[in-house]
Amino acid sequence: MQQARVRLAGTSPDDLDDICDDVRDIADTTGVNLSGPIPLPTKTLEIPTRKSPDGEGTATWEHWEMRVHKRLIDIDADERALRQLMRIQVPNDVSIEIVLED
């Protein structure tokens, strides 16, 4: 049977956990096997910028960072489960990637 690998990525870990709970509920209602959610390492994107707009004065820096959290879920590729999976309401800051594998 085919497996569907669902990759979730977003800046809010609470939103990711809510979507993982929705996927788990879908797997329970349709009776398909589920493994995960597997938390992947968090990627930290950091951008240092100068505080002063011109080049004068002391070199003081601000550091802006954004953390990207990721989750991985493997689910059996049942047609009913995948149809319900496509209907999940996803927030704007969360991206979902579904790949079918043998």
Curated annotation (Swiss-Prot):
GO terms for cellular component: small ribosomal subunit. The keyword Ribosomal protein applies. Gene3D superfamilies: Ribosomal protein S10 domain. Keywords: Ribonucleoprotein, Ribosomal protein. Coiled coil: none annotated. One of its GO terms (biological process) is translation. Residues 30-58 are annotated as: Disordered. One of its GO terms (molecular function) is structural constituent of ribosome. It comes from the Archaea. Involved in the binding of tRNA to the ribosomes. Belongs to the universal ribosomal protein uS10 family. HAMAP family: Ribosomal_uS10 (MF_00508). Part of the 30S ribosomal subunit. PANTHER family: 30S RIBOSOMAL PROTEIN S10 FAMILY MEMBER (PTHR11700). This is Small ribosomal subunit protein uS10. It comes from Haloquadratum walsbyi (strain DSM 16790 / HBSQ001).
